Amino acid sequence: MLTIPTADGVAEAIVATPPSGHGPGVLFFMDAFGLRPRIAEMAAEIASWGYVVLAPNVFYRDGSVADVAPRGDLSTPEGREAFWQVAGPRIGHLNADLAVADNATYLETLRELPEVTPGPVGVVGFCMGARLAVRAAGRDPDVAACAGFHAGGLVTEAQDSPHRELATARAEFLFGHADNDGSMTPENAKALGEALDAAGLAATNEIYEGAPHGYTMSDTAAWNEAAFLRAFANLKDLLARTLH
């Protein structure tokens, strides 16, 4: 596991490389449940398409990968909810200013990996990681692809709401929202689409019918295989269009 020095400590990170050993870079923002084997599996799948994937522990201020790892059985609704009570506050600790600073460090680290070929990069985020991905794309003109799946909190009334970053983005965007998600309602998705249109950005912005929040995570009770396959097929197409 790679270690990334930051202004506030050290973030551990997974690096997954393609069969060729080199390729365009993709920054992977984990969900609220931490940098665990499921995240490594997903990063490896993206890498198998021909990309170098960097997945940092974005909660490094709260502890190491081991410190913030899931406790209990996430595959039951009760276990998932119990760990959410532990993991949820960490999201609040990672405010917009900290996220912006971290993102710049992560993108610099990604580009400096010897396996990463010169050129545009992509970002992808899950759950609250989608917020980080949008912020990264809004601040870095060389981010050519940005995807977010079962995102939460992309559209708020706050001045630092992630969707306000879209005005300065250059990327193509892909969003696969969860269905019946209180953290990303149909009204939120509509407002996100309006912000994408106002910025003149190419985008796919969809609600995946019947897919719960967390649907990509096979180690949790929210797993929905059909929605995951749809999300990753769309992600594969996005990266192929924008990074090659």
Language-model regions, residue ranges each:
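N-terminal cap/leader regions of alpha/beta-hydrolase-fold enzymes
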Residues: 1-244
